[in-house]
């Protein structure tokens, strides 16, 4: 009898929870319409996978790409609408959040074509890969709009767990398994540190979890200048440093880049940065409004360390993926300048603009690496020697993307860095900008070293990998080449049309 009553109570409680969730989705679903499209795409993928006998079908790629494109379209139609807080304060919709969501969706849309031929060659499961990519994208989008500490943590873990699973996607590869374990342990530790910082904010604000309410709670409890805030700031900055691969919290990055499948590395190298930047700008600017000098100093130190260590260590690398890992550490150091500058001197606008350029430059480089790796089976930098003699299009594409990453004019990377450094100089960050300029020159050295190898024509330097290289046809239907071409064109011409991009980025104030 008692069990029967308890069972009825459980059913009633479950029904109430379900009805409340359904009510929230019914009345607030329009505010997360782009996310709902991705959820529908995920369900459709699962249904087709369960009911279809032929697993390797173009339908999976079509559904994934279509859901991402429709989600981008829905996001663009919602642009310039008034900021809205929905789901009882858990989710916020505004231009600032939406532009980061757009960048995440753009990354995912460009990354899926990179994976098609790779998955076919490695004979890995298609559905799992696409499910993890879409779920990670969904987690990143919710992270961009999360308005309270609990939603931030849940969205962050949704993104992180899918990232761990993607890095270990090739289960038979020992290096991939090793990279996954390191990524999982370091990611779990960083999440714990971040949540510990959140707990300090929760306690000091009198039990508030919404970002703006935390500020009001700190004012009411008179704790906004207490030592506890400094402790919370340190723990949250360390947690964010791991997520952003800022030095000295970057140790996991090279191993994960080298061991994970190359399309996965391409995906994680941009989406994780965009999602973590969206979180960092809001979590530092809103709850730590009264501690701006302190977190500015912390970020300056981390940015300087990242720019110097990232670029110095990149010079010594022999693996292309490890070199790009250290290069990305230096690149995120430049981006941090925009966060430190803030809204006062278009810091956020310069950060968003440079991230758009970085997506095209980085994904273009990884597309070239994926293509070369599939045709030769190597990742060693020396094995690229003489590639221009066999595949001029691939060699020129890689050279353009590397030069853009280095910041040489008239490519997009030059204009992005120029505006970022100019905003930092206007804000009085003279030492930080000087370090950025010096390390940018340093980065050009190791990029040019690779380009010199690509263009060499001396037979004694050309490795057997390039001698036996399979030349691609002039007109290829390869999806990797399609994605590579889009990224190379964007890396070349986006800087010339920078003014409208800046105007859009300047509308993203939150």
Curated annotation (Swiss-Prot):
Gene Ontology terms: biological process: ATP synthesis coupled electron transport; photosynthesis, light reaction
Family: Belongs to the complex I subunit 2 family.
Main location class: plastid
Protein name, as recorded: NAD(P)H-quinone oxidoreductase subunit 2 A, chloroplastic
Keywords: Chloroplast, Membrane, NAD, NADP, Plastid, Plastoquinone, Quinone, Thylakoid, Translocase, Transmembrane, Transmembrane helix, Transport
Membrane topology of this protein: Multi-pass membrane protein
NCBIfam families documented for this protein: NDH_I_N, PRK02504.1
A Pfam family reported for this protein in Swiss-Prot or TrEMBL: Proton_antipo_M
EC top class, as a word: translocase
Primary role: NDH shuttles electrons from NAD(P)H:plastoquinone, via FMN and iron-sulfur (Fe-S) centers, to quinones in the photosynthetic chain and possibly in a chloroplast respiratory chain. The immediate electron acceptor for the enzyme in this species is believed to be plastoquinone. Couples the redox reaction to proton translocation, and thus conserves the redox energy in a proton gradient.
InterPro entries, alphabetized: NADH-Q_OxRdtase_suN/2, ND/Mrp_TM, Ndh2_N
Transmembrane segments: 24-44, 59-79, 99-119, 124-144, 149-169, 184-204, 229-249, 261-281, 295-315, 323-343, 354-374, 395-415, 418-438, 484-504
Keyword Electron transport included in the entry's annotation: no
EC numbers on record: 7.1.1.-
Species: Zea mays (Maize)
Any one GO molecular function term: NADH dehydrogenase (ubiquinone) activity
Catalysed reactions, as listed in the record: a plastoquinone + NADH + (n+1) H(+)(in) = a plastoquinol + NAD(+) + n H(+)(out); a plastoquinone + NADPH + (n+1) H(+)(in) = a plastoquinol + NADP(+) + n H(+)(out)
Chloroplast as UniProt keyword: yes
Assembly and binders: NDH is composed of at least 16 different subunits, 5 of which are encoded in the nucleus.
């Amino acid at each position: 009898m008692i069990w029967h009553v308890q069972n009825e109570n459980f059913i009633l409680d479950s029904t109430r929870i379900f009805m409340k969730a359904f009510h929230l989705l019914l009345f607030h679903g329009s505010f997360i319409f782009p996310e709902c499209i991705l959820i529908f795409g995920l369900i459709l993928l699962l249904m087709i996978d369960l009911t279809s006998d032929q697993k390797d079908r173009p339908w999976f790629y079509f559904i994934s790409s279509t859901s991402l494109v429709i989600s981008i379209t829905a996001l663009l139609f919602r642009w310039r609408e008034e900021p809205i807080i929905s789901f009882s304060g858990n989710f916020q919709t505004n231009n600032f959040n939406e532009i980061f969501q757009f960048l995440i969706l753009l990354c995912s849309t460009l990354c899926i074509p990179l994976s098609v031929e790779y998955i076919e060659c490695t004979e890995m499961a298609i559905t799992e890969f696409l499910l993890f990519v879409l779920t990670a994208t969904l987690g990143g989008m919710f992270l961009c709009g999360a308005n309270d500490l609990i939603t931030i943590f849940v969205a962050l873990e949704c993104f992180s767990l899918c990232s761990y699973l993607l890095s270990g996607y090739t289960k038979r590869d020992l290096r991939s398994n090793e990279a996954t374990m390191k990524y999982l342990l370091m990611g779990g530790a960083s999440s714990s540190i971040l949540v510990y910082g959140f707990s300090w904010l929760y306690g000091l604000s009198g039990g508030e979890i919404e970002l703006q309410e935390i500020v009001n709670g700190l004012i009411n409890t008179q704790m906004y200048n207490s030592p506890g805030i400094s402790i919370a700031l340190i723990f949250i900055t360390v947690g964010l440093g791991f997520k952003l691969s800022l030095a000295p919290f970057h140790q996991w990055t090279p191993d994960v880049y080298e061991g994970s499948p190359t399309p996965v590395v391409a995906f994680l190298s941009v989406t994780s940065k965009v999602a973590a930047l969206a979180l960092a700008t809001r979590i530092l600017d809103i709850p730590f409004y009264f501690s701006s000098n302190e977190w500015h100093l912390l970020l300056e130190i981390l940015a300087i360390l990242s720019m110097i260590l990232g670029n110095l260590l990149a010079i010594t690398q022999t693996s292309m993926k490890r070199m790009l890992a250290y290069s990305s550490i230096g690149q995120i150091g430049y981006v941090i300048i925009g966060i430190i500058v803030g809204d006062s001197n278009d810091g956020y606008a310069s950060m968003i603009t440079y991230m758009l350029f970085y997506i095209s430059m980085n994904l273009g480089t990884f597309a070239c690496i994926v293509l070369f790796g599939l045709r030769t089976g190597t990742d060693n930098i020396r094995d690229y020697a003489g590639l221009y003699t066999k595949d001029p299009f691939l060699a020129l594409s890689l050279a353009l993307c590397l030069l853009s990453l280095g910041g040489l004019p008239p490519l997009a990377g030059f204009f992005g860095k120029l505006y970022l450094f100019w905003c930092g100089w206007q804000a009085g960050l003279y030492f930080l900008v000087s370090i950025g300029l010096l390390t940018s020159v340093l980065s050009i050295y190791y990029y040019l070293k690779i380009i010199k190898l690509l263009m060499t024509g001396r037979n004694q330097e050309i490795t057997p990998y390039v001698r036996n290289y399979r030349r691609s046809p002039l007109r290829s239907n390869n999806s990797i080449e399609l994605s590579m071409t889009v990224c190379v064109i964007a890396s070349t011409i986006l800087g010339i049309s920078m003014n409208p991009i800046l105007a859009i980025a300047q509308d993203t104030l939150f």
